Each structure stands twice: as structure tokens, then as C-alpha cells.
């Protein structure tokens, strides 16, 4: 009978190639249990496991006057941002690297974060854009075959603050009842609570152009370097190629990945790229991407959208949806606490079907302000807010949520096929 081997403790592999394998000599399995961690756990004489990260006393001070003692991980210092909560159970690395979170602290309602570490494949952009991460418990151990480092090390390297050991459930209830709040995270004991409170009350995220901080600086051709295992819904394609210009207001990699998988050749352009220059490139369609902040803070983007309407088919996602709403003559407004998570039910008004969607936005389009001919195609079933638009006369479609997910369900991936069909019909009629 074959003997199973077991590795005890925590191994620091430079390569995570070790896998459970079949032992042909003995007819059984040889099992190795691997834990990825940048530092081994130690067991002092007290029997308490020491945390493998540097921790400081920290505070979260909110503009409503509440003070939440915490422990820190990641970078030390003092930062100010808007606090929002995210209800996703998984995908914290995608959330960390989503440019739409620029200017915000993200509180995860899932009580245990960090279990799977981080890896290069799950990033949605080249850096972390959120200001800080707020969690209940930071996992002591990290276990995943793709893991290359711990969450604490990852945040430290990117100069992002993280705090844990707070009552995140109580904070979430406060945000749900009172709305999003400006807060200050600090590890600096020399600063008084009153000083931090005054900081939180002297700053506002409304009206700030955050898109210019996250957009690319020059156009580039997007080449998908992702493992083919990411792909799905391959039977939905017609084998044709479509040239798409993607306006980068804070675009996520998986939006580009999904477009590419449907046969699109993508040129990504900055948020300030002139509409006339975009049209000179003779695209089959234009995508207006997701992005952070207030759509009213970027009138230059609204003007660009207006200039492109009716010229080629356009597709807006999240911020792109809001900019389209304004360009069509509608108004946007700031929501009480926004939608952030991977479990939001949305009804497709055309089919009656309900999709579970990934969402991340603090603003919404007021459907009552839209002109005639603009159809509200999707509605959020939690609060009845507008979740999708269509204006067939100008070949316009948009979604307030994220059909590419990452993280989140894939219920809405069909929206990319609908954009392909929109471009296809436009080419056939021209």
C-alpha cells in the first residue's frame, strides 16, 4: 500500500508546480499540502500563532463623528476617501485593481479576506486605484496554487492602506442607513481624533475629475495575453472581425478580454481623445468604459460622446452608461450608498428575464429626464433604478452594471454579443 506524504507547516515555494499526483509505483496517490505565504508562521511558547505581517494601531474616523479603532496592514500613514461597502464574497484582488474605486475606501462585508493571496492573472489593471481596504479579519494563512504573495505584502508594495479588526457589519449598517461617508484612515498616533474628524469634513468626492487620473495617456492596441482558460461562450461567435475603439475612463481588463473573445480588434484611447480622430480610424463600434466618480465632473467626456452619437454603434458600461445618459439629454444623480457587489438582481424589460449582476457605481441615470425614444431596457430590482438604456435610432446601447463581471456572475455576458449584432446590422445597412 502506498504511503501518502504530507508537508507540515507553511512552505515558501518559488514555483507552485507541486500538485497531488498519482504514484504509479505503488498504485496510490502521493499528496503534498502546500501553503503559499511570504513568511512562515511561528508558534511561540504561548501557543498563539504570530501574524506574518507588520501591524500598527489604526483608526477609521468618519465624517459623522464615529471613530473605529483598528489594526493596520499594508502601508502606514493617513489617507482620506469616500467609504463604500462591497458585498462580493470573492474577487478581492479584482476589486483592488478596478480603477472605478479611485478615491474610495472599500469595506468588504465578507468577514474573512486574504485566504487566497494574490496572483498576476486576476488583476483588472496595472495597479491598485482604491485608497484603502477595510475588512473584519485578515487571514493568517494564504492557500492557493496560483498565489505569489500575501495580501498584506501586495498592499505594502503598492502603498495602499489596509485595516482590519473592525466591526464591519455595524459600519455597513451605518452606511446603508445614512449613505456613503467620507472617512480618514490613519496609523499616525500623533494626530488627534478631532484633527482626523476635521479632515473628513473638509473634503468631498463630488465634482472631482477622477477619470483623468486613471485613464491611459496615449492610444494603444490591446493584445490579449490571458490564458485561454478564461474564455467561455465560444459557440456564440460568427467568426467575423470588428474594429472597436474603447474609450478608457478606467477600463477593466476583462471588458477588453470579452470583446476580444468575440472577434473584436481593440484600440484603447484616452478619455480626452478627440471624437474626430476616433472617427478617422473608421471603427465598426465604440465602447465607453467604466470609470470612477461623478459623470458631471467630466463635461469634456460628455461632449465627446455627443459628437460620436449617430456616427457608429456605441456601447456604454457603468460610467459610459451615465455619460451616454447625459449626452442624450438626461440627468444623473448621486445614490445614497451606491451599488457595489456581485449579487444585484436586474430585470431585462425586453425578455422579462432576471440576471444576477456585478455592479460598482455611486451614480445613476434619472429615467424621467430622458427624451422620447430612449428605452430603459434594464431595471435594478433592489431599488428600481435604471440599469440599461437603448436608443435604436442612433445605435446606442448601455448597461449600468458590469456584464464582464470579474468578479461576479456571467449572466450578462450576452450583452457583448448584442453589441456585436448591433455593429453587424450597422455594417450591413451602410
Swiss-Prot record:
SMART domains for this protein: CPSase_sm_chain (SM01097)
Up-regulation conditions: By phosphate starvation in shoot.
Main localization, broad class: plastid
InterPro entries (alphabetical): CarbamoylP_synth_ssu, CarbamoylP_synth_ssu_N, CarbP_synth_ssu_N_sf, Class_I_gatase-like, CPSase_GATase1, GATASE
GO cellular component: carbamoyl-phosphate synthase complex; chloroplast; chloroplast stroma
Active site per database record: 318, 402, 404
The protein's annotated pathway: Amino-acid biosynthesis; L-arginine biosynthesis; carbamoyl phosphate from bicarbonate: step 1/1; Pyrimidine metabolism; UMP biosynthesis via de novo pathway; (S)-dihydroorotate from bicarbonate: step 1/3
Record-level GO BP terms: 'de novo' pyrimidine nucleobase biosynthetic process; 'de novo' UMP biosynthetic process; cellular response to phosphate starvation; glutamine metabolic process; L-arginine biosynthetic process
Keyword terms: Amino-acid biosynthesis, Arginine biosynthesis, ATP-binding, Chloroplast, Glutamine amidotransferase, Ligase, Nucleotide-binding, Plastid, Pyrimidine biosynthesis, Transit peptide
Family annotation (HAMAP family): CPSase_S_chain
CDD domains, per the entry: GATase1_CPSase
Domain Glutamine amidotransferase type-1: 243-429
Organism per entry: Arabidopsis thaliana
Localization in the cell: Plastid, Chloroplast
Miscellaneous note of the record: The ven6-1 phenotype is rescued by exogenous application of citrulline, an arginine precursor.
Family note: Belongs to the CarA family.
Lineage, opening ranks: Eukaryota, Viridiplantae, Streptophyta, Embryophyta, Tracheophyta
Official protein name in the record: Carbamoyl phosphate synthase small chain, chloroplastic
E.C. number(s) listed in UniProt: 6.3.5.5
Catalytic activity: hydrogencarbonate + L-glutamine + 2 ATP + H2O = carbamoyl phosphate + L-glutamate + 2 ADP + phosphate + 2 H(+)
